[in-house]
Structure formats: C-alpha cells, structure tokens
Curated annotation (Swiss-Prot):
The modification N6-(pyridoxal phosphate)lysine is found at residue 265. It is found in: Cytoplasm. It comes from the Bacteria. It is an enzyme of class 5 (isomerase). Homodimer. This is Glutamate-1-semialdehyde 2,1-aminomutase. Gene3D superfamilies: Aspartate Aminotransferase, domain 1 (3.90.1150.10), Type I PLP-dependent aspartate aminotransferase-like (Major domain) (3.40.640.10). Its EC number is 5.4.3.8. Its cofactor is pyridoxal 5'-phosphate. One of its GO terms (molecular function) is pyridoxal phosphate binding.
Length: 427
C-alpha cells in the first residue's frame, strides 16, 4: 500500500469520509486522495514524495504560489507577538483600508474567517436593511454551506449529484428562489412577480463551483438595474473570483457595482480569512452600530491578516495581472489545442487567473449545460494527468487556478503531459 492509501484508511476511522471537505475525497473521480506533505511555488509533494504541478492552489488563495517568501516573512514577523487577541489591532485597519482601496464599491468592510460566514452575514445584513425575507440565487452557484444557500448549489453538492443538501428545513428553503444563471427573461419574470419581497440577489459574477461559467454582461447589468428598481440588495459573491479575475475583481472586469461584496481566499493568502463589505448606509446596520448581529472569535486574526495584507500588496505589482492572465490563457488555449489535435471533444476557457476544462463541444453558459459534459472522460483525463504529476481539481465541476509561479516551463510541462493524456483518451 502507498502512504496515501495508509493515511486515507487511517483518516476514515476518525474523520467522516476521511476528509474535512467532501471534494477532497476523490469520490467523483475514484481512487485515493493525495495527502499533501509540503508545497512550494506551483508544486506540492504527496505523502509518497511524488511532486505535482498544482492547479487548485488550495481552491484559489495561493495566487502568488505556495510559501511565497514575502508572505512567509510577514507571518513570521507577527507570530511572536501573539496568535489571537479577541481585541482590535492596527493590522485590521490596514487590511480594511487596502480592501476598500482596491474594490471601490466597498466603503466599509467586516472581516470574518470563511467564505460561508461572509455570505451568510451579507444575507442577514441585506434582510435587516430591507426588512424583507426572500433571497434570489442561481442554479449551480455555490455560496458556502449556510442552510438558505444550499439549494440547487454547485461545488461539492454538484460533484455528488445532489445539488440540494439534506438537513435543510423546508421552512428555510422556501425563502430562497433559484433561477437559471445567465437567464435575463427568468430574472425579469421573478422581479415582476415578487420584486417587492426580494431582500437580496446573490450571485457569483464569475461562477467557479459548477466549473468556470462566466456571467454575461447582459445578465449582470440586468441584475444591477432590477435590484436598483425594486430596492433589493445586489450581492456579488467574489469569494472565489475576487482578486482572481482582475485586481478589482469581477466588478472591475465588468464595470458593474454591487451593493455588498463577499471576499475570501486571496485576502487570506492561504490563511483562514474572508470579508464582506459595501455601501456605508447598509454596513451601518451591523452591530454594534445597528440591529443586525454578527460576530466571530477569530475575525481579523492577526496571523491571517498578516498573510492576507502582504498578498494584497504583492498582487499590485505593475504587470502582475497582465502576466498572470496571459499564462492562464496560454494553459487553457494549449489544452484545447492538444485535445483538438487528438480528436477529443473538449473546450476550455479562462478569465484572469481562473480556468475551466470541459469535455463538451463548447464552453457552457449555464448549470444545465455544465451537467451535460462527459464526466466519465474527465475522470479518465484527471487520472492520466495525475499519473503525469499534474493535479487538476478532482471534480468535473470545479474551476482551476494559476499562480504567478506557474512559469513557461511549468505550462510547457503541463501541455506535454496533456498531449500524452489526450492521445490515450483517443486510443
């Protein structure tokens, strides 16, 4: 038995399914999960000492690569001062100022410890601000594992074939209306029917949890206009795409301003940190100023803030996003070219430093189109690439991520491995 197999068997005795987040279990692709022993730059090494090119980057946070020396130094510099205080620090102000500078729609921001906390808190705030209960979300968009959002969601739920979680009471789910992503007509119909009941619309402007699916400009502009017209709060869930698709996130890319924005992943630099923020008049309803309660023991943790602040400083380097976007596009275009040369039906897309791989004739634009992709062929491709030392997401329904450490040599090695994998698929 390999060390990975030994660890997986051991883990299953004390951890449900042997993992602390379902997609890590390899259930949809089969086989044994890779247990990571260490990581550096664009690589990680598993428990058997095998090196992999890493295209999940902890599901998005590692935009400057694993163990970036300046991020490491920033963390080391604060460790001796204390791990957690439960009281305000100057560093919290510094990261808040940085976030507000980079995302102009955010006038005030509140730090939390996870993306789920961010979206859950933003929805509570929107309901408190509007005095309404109904939430609108979209098929395949994943906004964390709060009850009201686990309805026709993406991510691990979609991976396991049941997009609505057990354990979500009908009395909670009834306040969530689910519409088709990128469907403007359905959106207009919903607002026409019950627009005065809608507290908020929450959306991934670039969805990454049903694979990569871009919101169309028409769809996102319609969202903005309808929310404004009906007094609903527009929430952009940029936990994944924030600081990934552009320095100012999807709002910069599309030129659309949200009322509230949820952030995570990159803002923690690999540490557990997230945030939600937006218009000052809405944020004023949060305790201790207003009646909407939200709190957290580890919110604004000094170690996480140090890693996140340094990461946010690094990504502002001139040309950072131009180079990162170009490398990501080179990967996606190169994979599509290799598949085409082998005669394998395949499509790829990228935006900023996110990419999607689809065993389908074209890039999907909705949840329904994503679910028509050839998952069996994806699973074979995943394992062929894994054998080659390339680690893509172990699910056909997750986006991939490129870091600034994925240089030409890394992309070249990936494409060479893909050439062999597609040839094997076509045989």
């Amino acid at each position: 038995m390999s060390n990975n197999q030994i660890l997986f068997e051991r883990a299953q005795k004390t951890i449900p399914g042997g993992v602390n987040s379902p997609v890590r279990a390899f259930r949809s692709v089969g086989g044994t999960p890779r247990f990571v022993s260490r990581a550096q730059g664009p690589y990680f090494w598993d428990a058997d000492g095998k090196q992999y090119i890493d295209y999940i980057g902890s599901w998005g946070p590692m935009i400057v690569g694993h163990v970036h020396p300046e991020v490491l130094s920033a963390v080391q510099n604060v460790l001796a001062d204390g791990f957690s205080f439960g009281a305000p620090t100057e560093a919290e102000i510094e990261i808040a100022e940085e976030i507000c500078k980079l995302v102009p729609s955010i006038e005030q921001v509140r730090m939390v410890s996870s993306g789920t906390e961010a979206t859950m808190s933003a929805l509570r705030l929107a309901r408190g601000f509007t005095g309404r209960s109904r939430i609108v979300k979209f098929e395949g968009c994943y906004h964390g594992h709060a009850d009201s959002l686990l309805v026709k969601a993406g991510s691990g739920l979609l991976t396991f074939g049941n997009p609505t979680s057990a354990g979500v009471p009908a009395d909670i789910a009834k306040h969530t209306t689910v519409l088709e992503y990128n469907n403007v007509a359905a959106l207009e119909e919903a607002f026409g029917a019950f627009g005065d009941e809608i507290a908020a619309v929450i959306v991934e402007p670039v969805a990454g949890n049903m694979n990569l699916v871009r919101g169309t400009p028409e769809f996102l502009n319609a969202l903005r206009a309808l929310c404004t017209k009906h007094g609903a709060v527009l929430i952009f869930d940029e936990v994944m795409c924030g600081f990934r698709v552009a320095l100012g996130g999807a709002q910069q890319h599309y030129g659309i301003t949200a009322d509230l924005t949820c952030l995570g992943k990159v803002i923690g630099g690999g540490m557990p940190a997230a945030a939600f923020g937006g218009r000052r008049d809405i944020m004023a309803h949060l305790a201790p100023l207003g009646g909407v309660y939200q709190a957290g023991t580890l919110s604004g943790n000094p170690i996480a803030v140090a890693a996140g602040l340094k990461t946010l400083q690094l990504i502002q380097a001139p040309g950072f996003y131009d180079a990162l976007t170009a490398q990501t596009k080179r990967l996606a275009d190169g994979l599509a070219a290799e598949a085409r040369a082998a005669g394998v039906p395949f499509a790829a897309d990228s935006i900023g430093a996110m990419f999607g791989l689809y065993f389908a004739e074209r890039v999907p634009t909705s949840f329904a189109e994503v679910t028509k992709s050839d998952t069996e062929r994806f699973n074979r491709f995943f394992h062929l690439m894994l054998d080659e030392g390339v680690y893509f997401a172990p699910s056909a329904y997750e986006a991939g991520f490129v870091s600034s450490t994925h240089d030409d040599a890394v992309i070249d090695a990936t494409l060479a491995a893909a050439r062999r994998a597609f040839a094997a698929l076509a045989a």
